[in-house]
From Swiss-Prot:
PANTHER family: ARGINASE/AGMATINASE, FORMIMIDOYLGLUTAMASE. Belongs to the arginase family. The gene is hutG. One of its GO terms (biological process) is L-histidine catabolic process to glutamate and formate. This is Formimidoylglutamase. Mn(2+) 1 binds at H130, D155, D159, D246. It comes from the Bacteria.
Length: 318
């Protein structure tokens, strides 16, 4: 497959505790590592797919480095304990973008996602900048042409920018246009957005598209019940969910390893409270974690936070 490569076995390394007990397992021992892109061999698994691309971040005037995110996240995951759901993970490698060829890389990821989904393999994509979302979303729409797809984006930014070329700030505007072209419902919710980080033009665009915005300061602990009810309402309106988590939705002290660290953000514990019902709804078909930039991590804090999110997501998914 174009631009695809297998993950090196050296990425999945960790502490071996099997001398203690047969079930003293870690992810590096239970994640299946495929040398070929063969989703047909892993029906009812969750595929880890890397998207080694930050071309969209560069175009959006961000800090490059997210192309190194997928393997960094894999390494952070490798030594975590393996529990329920983690034995259903298979690493199906990564798409590696060539310089200045964003559209080609996005097409390759879309094709890979569609192939997985058509083989009953759910997709957990590791970005990469948030340009990942356009490719992942198109892959889902193409795999499920007759289903109502809901997009839930946990993100400090609405990512509905107007731009002469695709960037990490345009994916949901692109998906809205894709839906219009294909006569599909565009059902978009952004949770954790910062009003301080989104211009009025972006808010107006969200309103034009009938998007739902739940601002970061509406996700305080005392307001979680209301947010949870909003999430339940969203789940009732669609057949399946594509959930995308831009790691800059976390506060900077928990996630320094992004292009645009958040001054406020949603703390990791609160974010987990919000994603749990989505993961356990039976409607989550695809998810990704994007914008992880190892070049700006501090003592591995960001890598571990991202890994805990991915670990928890997989644990709740099955």
């Amino acid at each position: 497959m174009n631009l695809w490569h297998a993950t090196s076995p050296t990425i999945w390394q960790g502490r071996n505790d099997l001398a203690e007990a047969d079930n003293a397992l870690r992810l590096f021992q239970t994640v299946k590592l495929s040398p070929y892109f063969t989703p047909e061999e892993f029906s009812h698994y969750v595929a880890l797919l890397g998207f080694e691309c930050d071309e969209g971040v560069k175009r959006n005037q961000g800090r490059p480095g997210a192309n190194q995110g997928p393997d960094y996240l894999r390494q952070s995951l490798a030594n975590m304990a393996s529990h329920k759901g983690h034995d259903k993970l298979v690493d199906l490698g990564s798409i590696r973008a060539n310089p200045n060829q964003l559209s080609e890389a996005q097409q390759a990821l879309s094709d890979a996602v569609t192939q997985c989904q058509c083989q009953n393999v759910r997709t957990l994509v590791l970005g990469g900048g948030h340009e990942t979302a356009f490719a992942h979303g198109v892959g889902i729409y193409d795999a499920f042409p007759h289903q109502r797809v809901g997009i839930i984006n946990f993100d400090a930014h609405l990512d509905l920018r107007r731009s002469p070329q695709p960037t990490s700030g345009t994916p949901f505007r692109q998906l809205a246009e894709y839906c219009q072209q294909h006569q599909r419902l565009f059902h978009y919710t952004c949770i954790g957005a910062s009003l301080a980080s989104n211009t009025q033009a972006l808010v107006d665009e969200a309103n034009r598209l009938n998007a739902t915005i739940i601002w970061d300061n509406q996700c305080r602990e005392t307001m979680l019940d209301k947010v949870q009810q909003q999430i339940q309402d969203i789940l009732q309106q669609v057949d399946l969910i594509y959930m995308t988590i831009d790691l800059d939705v976390l506060p900077a002290y928990q996630m320094p390893a992004v292009s645009a660290p958040a001054a406020l953000g949603l703390p990791l514990e609160r974010l987990l409270q919000l994603i749990q019902p989505i993961c356990q709804s039976g409607k989550l078909q695809a998810a990704d974690l994007v914008e992880l930039n190892p070049l700006f991590d501090i003592q591995g804090i960001g890598g571990r936070a991202a890994a805990r999110l991915a670990w928890q997501l997989a644990h709740w998914w099955y």
